[in-house]
Amino acid sequence: MTELTTIAFDIETTGFETDDKLTVVGFDSAVSSRVFLNTGGSTPTTGLADRVNDTLQTPVQLTLHDSEPELLTELATFVTSTLTQRDAKLVAYNGERWNGGFDLPFLRTRFCTHGLEWPFGTLPYVDVMDVFEKRFNTSEDSLSGVYGELIGSGLNDLDPFADSGEAVTVWEAGAYEPLITHNVADIRRTRALMELAERYCSKSDFSMKSLEPVI
């Protein structure tokens, strides 16, 4: 487990339905974060990336995309040219589990909708939520709740949203800075929890799966 670098990821969307869209996709490693923003064709205020980086200690590389297909195309290029070339594992919190999850099913639907190939095939995947449900005695099950109980306030204080539903409202209003900050808080909380779990749990406690399609 630990010989594979953790790449945490999380997405933001306009909702949960089949025709809802991606607004943000973020990845985080120990070195930096990589964030893709769908602007829906709008023009963000000047200096957005600089303001985001002024708020956050570890660098964030931000790219802007006018549409969801453009975001997905650039995302696929990043995954295949960068992530799959590393000894890395993809990690999410409730991204995809045996009984559900959100991020990966949503991504599959959007790639399929636009007729794009699935880019994550060679990356192993771990859902860290499973470990904390089974191997830690916590009273919370949300990402922020488990992080707060086991690690402390830290990145929870960074998150500008009290409810993830705010991510939809601010995107529609073109208020991208808090949306990006929320996503970065999520991916960094996810990576922090994965590192915590690796310090206290055995390899057999983690369920690692392949994301490679059959065909």
Which stretches of residues belong to each language-model region?
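Terminal disorder- and signal-encoded targeting elements
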Residues: 1-5, 208-215
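Conserved non-catalytic scaffold segment of RNase H-like nuclease domains
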Residues: 2-108
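Metal-dependent phosphoesterase core characteristic of DEDDh/y 3'-5' exonuclease domains
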Residues: 30, 87-207, 211
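Short alpha-helical "patches" and their helix-cap loops
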Residues: 38-43, 206-213
